[in-house]
Amino acid sequence: RVREDFNDGWRFHLGDVPEAYSAAYDDSGWRELELPHDWAVEGDFSIDNPSGTGGGALPGGIGWYRKTFVAPENEADRVWRLEFDGVYMNSEVFVNGESLGVRPYGYISFCYDISPYLRWGEENVIAVRVDNAEQPNSRWYSGCGIYRNVWMLKTSELCIPSDGLFCYVASMDMNRIDRTDRKSTRLNSSHQVLS
């Protein structure tokens, strides 16, 4: 299991660009940046912004993030999972033009298996559309964008997934913890078991 920081080398554009999901889209004119990133704090404070004073009086909107990287051929036997610690809000993630899914709202981490969409030994493009245009949507300043870290998790096909192992405590007080025999484990496998 290898967990790599995936925050460097992103490009950003504030505004909706419907064709930006495509791997062939030319993002060379976009701003280069490192994540985490919040585009709202780069805007002007104004009570006229749709978020209102309860949302920090900062602008919302729609933004796109893109990153190009090479997936080495010698790692094609690994499962690659793209992990987002936080994106606010209503994000959709694409790999090489294929939508992996939509994450509504934005206060929870999420992960996608990108292995089936990778081009081994070639350039790959991740595109993330973030939609925080519908304002106000919270009672405090929420930010806009990929506001937490992004990770690339590489594992073998047979592995214990993140958050897949749990330990339980039967009872606990200030002086003592009683163990329990209750255990829970999940196992990821892309292999079929035949009997």
Regions found by a protein language model. Give the residues of each.
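Generic low-complexity segments that are intrinsically disordered, proline-rich and/or Lys/Arg-biased
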Residues: 37, 60, 192-193
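Beta-strand-rich binding/interaction modules
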Residues: 95, 177-186
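Short, solvent-exposed beta-strand/turn "edge" segments of beta-rich domains on protein surfaces
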Residues: 54-60, 170-178
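Accessory beta-strand-rich segments of carbohydrate-active enzymes
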Residues: 4, 14-16, 60-170
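Single conserved hydrophobic/aromatic residue that forms the stacking wall/gate
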Residues: 183-195
